[in-house]
Each structure stands twice: as C-alpha cells, then as structure tokens.
Amino acid sequence: MQGAIAESAKNAHRDYTMIENLDPQQAWDLLQNNSDAVLVDVRTKVEHSFVGHPPGAISIPWKEAPDWQVNPQFVAEVKKIVLDRNAPILLLCRSGQRSLDAAKALEEAGYQLLINIVDGFEGALDEHKHRGNLGGWRFQGLPWEQS
C-alpha cells in the first residue's frame, strides 16, 4: 500500500481528492521518502508538548480545551504552512478520529492528498483503559520527542 501512496504523492496534477488511512509505520516511511510531505499534529497544544510528538510535526489543533470546539482557523493555519494543495498532508491525533475529521475539512478546502494516521500517537484503549499498549506512533517505536 505504501508504494501506491508514494506514487500517488508524486502525481501533482490530479482532479480528485483522496483520504488514505496509513498506520504509523507507513506514515513514517512516507515522510522519510517524500520531502514534500507535511505532518500536521491536530491534537491540543498541551498534548503535543507534554505527551510528545513526532520530530518535525507541525502543531495545528483541530480542537482546543476547554470548550473542545472545532478550531475555526484550522484550515487557514494549514494554508499558511502548506501552499501546494497537491502535497501529501499526514494528519495525526491521539487515536485517529480528530485527524480524520480534520482531513475531511481540508478535503473540502481543496487539498488533494490527505493521509489519516490510524491509531494516532497513542492508539486505542486497552482492557485497563490505558493508551499506548495496543497501537499508535509511540507503540510502534517510531521517533518522538517532547517540547
């Protein structure tokens, strides 16, 4: 699948939008092999700083505490960072839902290659209601840091 994504990312003149789902390892591989790819962390600023984030991830929250309403400036903030609407944009949240919602908003704004990182940074809850034990960026042992 990653080969198809990489090939799609090279095609700069498409007339359709695509939201792909990649696991964290596939997303990391794409980031390493495509210098045009941009990783947007849609979690809150607190999550990004204190829970951790992949190196190079750009923090643009989809929702922010305390009201957890959609950030009305989200698309505008992405537009400031990602000028090429055909560049691959990878979206990361805690477990994969906020990033999918953010991808849909970017799709409506005309971005062409959107990638939701399934399981996000921390993954789903395990039987003890803990994250980070079943999947996610950190669980897969990928590079991350705190700020």
How does the language model describe each region?
Residues 92:
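Short, surface-exposed ligand- or partner-binding patches at beta-edge/loop junctions that are enriched
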Residues 41, 96:
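Conserved G/P- and acidic residue-centered "switch" motifs that form tight phosphate/ATP-binding loops
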Residues 1-37, 45-88, 99-147:
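Rhodanese-like catalytic fold shared by cysteine-dependent sulfurtransferases
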